[in-house]
């Protein structure tokens, strides 16, 4: 794993975002922010606000700090706004798109599917979660893995995301396959983040 183990609900509460379905249920049961029914919290400094936003982005893609820094460096060299380019860069990771497609339930599960060799791209096994998928690449579960329980659940829509599948993906869950039709644009990516604060954190 990219990060040290920590209870996902506790981590979700600290960051103010639901990282797993269990955390979603927790937030539904306790819609108030941490501290509202306990001792008050100090007002955060600008640095802490930026740090929190950076940590939130890291958590949603389950990245190490080094991985996020590398993605930021690549994004800063594009002709796009650095923040938008950063999120798009991360969204093209293989594990992120396995999650978006509905083949996996969480980013953690998606990462394990890739690492354990269950996923192929254009007919070739890829076991690196950081692999960057390109437009027109076809991603699917390997034939030898399709009868595993997890993939049987996925095939029946058990892991399908709430709402619409992102428009940049063409998904066939029955075949446990999807294609990246085009590069995502930031507004389509279901990530909770003010990426400009992340840029400000690294540019300080």
From Swiss-Prot:
One of its GO terms (cellular component) is small ribosomal subunit. GO terms for biological process: ribosomal small subunit biogenesis; translation. The keyword Ligase does not apply. GO terms for molecular function: rRNA binding; structural constituent of ribosome. It holds the Pfam family Ribosomal_S4. SMART domains: Ribosomal_S4 (SM01390), S4 (SM00363). HAMAP family: Ribosomal_uS4_B. Part of the 30S ribosomal subunit. Contacts protein S5. The interaction surface between S4 and S5 is involved in control of translational fidelity. Belongs to the universal ribosomal protein uS4 family. One of the primary rRNA binding proteins, it binds directly to 16S rRNA where it nucleates assembly of the body of the 30S subunit. PANTHER family: 30S 40S RIBOSOMAL PROTEIN (PTHR11831), SMALL RIBOSOMAL SUBUNIT PROTEIN US4M (PTHR11831:SF4). This is Small ribosomal subunit protein uS4. It comes from Streptomyces coelicolor (strain ATCC BAA-471 / A3(2) / M145).
